[in-house]
A protein has these predicted regions:
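Residue-level detector of alpha-helix initiation sites
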Residues: 12, 16-21, 153, 258-259, ...
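FAD-dependent oxidoreductase catalytic-site/capping-region signature
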Residues: 2-8, 124, 130-179, 186-188, ...
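N-terminal glycine-rich phosphate/pyrophosphate-binding loop and immediately adjacent elements
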Residues: 2-128, 287, 297-306
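Loop/turn elements at helix/coil->beta-strand transitions in domains of secreted/extracellular proteins
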Residues: 7, 29-34, 119-120, 212-215, ...
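Glycine-rich loop(s) and the adjacent beta-strand/alpha-helix scaffold that form part
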Residues: 29, 33, 40-45, 225, ...
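Conserved redox-cofactor binding core of oxidoreductases
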Residues: 111-232, 238, 301-324
């Protein structure tokens, strides 16, 4: 039978971080016929699998949509690139592999937006459901899930120096940012298994790819939903310039991410009526919240040249063979290193209060932006990336045309909020004090912000900013949002959104683990028909 004639129980749009989880859980019921559609292709590339090659994946159109935003007036009209996975595993195939869940109160506060059933006690079991933690099994961790989480497979003395300097500055040492408290400094855990990236494709999709009731189609462009009498009955795609329809007798689940999901809704007639009419699209549901509430963590890089060897010098040709063999046979060494080896979480006003800043620490430095080639300096250096965790700044995503091949209009100014900018100034001043503390200070040759006043630090911020690459919130749950608390699109039957876009407020930390949790909880809602 032609796939276009099959009546699918579930059609999942996007084989990304959430989509792979959903495909696994929904197809576990043998009577469910599940169709998974993806614009990209398999994640078989070695660039995805090898942690040290992550910069060669990020921002590459083979794997990444590379959406470009409108000029940012707060940064001299820079046009930021908003990465979004275009490959099996989505963002989990591109990201820095850092396993952070956020803070307990992040989820408890979602209730303030009219969201029920998502407090920390509600979501913890779904974090545990996916997790297979190599190192710990406690009330906060599990060793029974498909997703492997591991400690670092490589250490560098600068890791310990950073941790000790932070402790001397006043931060407690923290061996588990996903346990009792996030506050403090310590080494990260990573989405890795045997020194390889562990994305949701390798953990959830590939092990079940041969299930008879699951069909995965790659390389297709999602155009729009087919809606009749306020009910989704199918999906229209473009496959090699040919329009095709797939029929749904159950639910369609949007898992196209915080840029892709609102665009599909808008092209389908769900969104701000004025935008839809402007683009000659029939209005199915007038909801101005679609595409609004775009959030990310604004960040700033600082590079510190040092007087000892870092991975910059270890990756030179005379040493890379040794490290390559170590990784190949042991899954360890510098090649297994995630994007950061340590993190520090603190409050920019009172250091031990609820963290609103996160420092990513790496015993290597690199020069990179999504539009430029990755460059690893040949001198030894440290790189830190400091993010504001509770940003006030919000943007939006809108379609530029009903043509699915046209890019979106992304409006987001990284430093539109003076409070965010002030918090970053405070965060960098605290970081500068940490890097001036023993024992790490004896290795630092230049501390870039130590002699700058607040005005100069603001200029430094605007010249060294980056997106946290944690786009969230554009199809959010809540009273004023797009979805109800069960992830169903309001005023339309048989349609849910399950990805990072559902968060009413971005969590305080890296978002990948939370998206996997959302997918686990969403799958449970679907299977229980809630």
């Amino acid at each position: 039978m032609s796939l276009e004639k099959v009546e699918w129980d579930y059609i999942i749009l996007g084989a990304g971080t959430a989509g792979c989880v959903l495909a696994n859980r929904l197809s576990a019921v043998k009577n469910n016929r599940v169709l998974l559609l993806e614009a990209g292709y398999s994640d078989r590339s070695i660039k995805i699998k090898v942690p040290a090659l992550q910069p060669y994946v990020f921002g590459k159109k083979e794997f990444d949509w590379c959406y470009q935003a409108q000029p940012d007036k707060t940064r001299n009209n820079v046009r930021s690139i908003w990465p979004a996975g275009k490959v099996w595993g989505g963002g989990s195939s591109l990201n820095g592999m850092i396993y952070i869940r956020g803070q307990k109160d992040d989820f408890n506060e979602w209730k303030n937006f009219g969201v029920d059933g998502w407090n920390f006690e509600d979501v913890l079991k779904y974090f545990l459901k996916s997790e297979n933690n190599e190192e710990t099994n406690s009330n906060y961790h599990s060793q029974n899930g498909p997703l492997n989480i591991s400690n670092l497979k490589s250490n560098h003395l600068l890791n310990e120096a950073f941790i000790d300097a932070s402790a001397n500055f006043g931060l407690p040492k923290n061996n588990d940012f996903n346990g009792i408290s996030q506050t403090g400094v310590g080494k990260v855990q990573a989405f890795q298994k045997k020194g390889l990236r562990q994305n949701t494709s390798s953990a959830f999709l590939k092990p079940i790819i041969k299930r008879a009731n699951l069909k995965v189609i790659s390389g297709v462009l999602i155009n729009k939903l087919i809606i009749k009498d306020s009910k989704v009955i199918g999906i229209n795609i473009i496959d090699k310039n040919i329009s095709k329809n797939f029929i749904s007798k159950g639910e369609v689940i949007l898992s196209a991410g915080s840029i892709g999901s609102p665009m599909i809704l808008q092209r389908s007639g769900i969104g701000d009526a004025s935008l839809l009419k402007k683009n000659d699209i029939k209005v199915e549901v007038n909801n101005k919240a679609v595409g609004e509430n775009l959030q990310d963590h604004p960040g700033v890089y600082c590079e510190y040249p040092v007087n000892i060897s870092t991975y910059n010098t270890e990756f030179k040709f005379n040493k890379i063979v040794k490290h390559g063999l170590n990784w190949l046979f042991n899954g360890s060494g510098p090649i297994s290193t995630p994007a950061a080896t340590c993190c520090a979480f603190f409050n920019t006003n009172k250091i031990l209060d609820r963290p609103n800043a996160q420092v990513h620490f790496s015993p290597f430095s690199y020069h990179y932006s999504p539009l430029s080639k990755f460059h690893l300096p040949d001198y030894p250096a440290i790189l830190t990336g400091t993010c504001i965790l509770n940003p006030e700044t919000k943007g939006r995503v809108n379609i530029s045309s009903k043509d699915p091949q046209r890019p979106p209009i992304i409006e987001h100014s990284l430093w539109a909020s003076e409070k965010d900018l002030t918090n970053m100034v405070k965060a960098l001043k605290k970081l500068s004090q940490i890097m001036s503390s023993k024992p790490i200070s004896k290795y630092i040759l230049n501390n870039p912000t130590s002699k700058l006043n607040d005005i100069q630090i603001k200029d430094f911020i605007k010249s060294n900013s980056f997106l946290g690459y944690h786009a969230s919130g554009t199809c959010c749950m809540g009273d004023k949002g797009v979805l109800n608390s069960n992830l169903k699109v309001k005023s339309i039957k048989n349609l849910r959104v399950i990805d990072a876009s559902v968060m009413p407020k971005i969590i305080r930390g890296n978002t990948n683990a939370t998206v996997i949790m959302i997918a686990e909880k969403g799958a449970d809602y679907i299977l229980r028909k809630r």
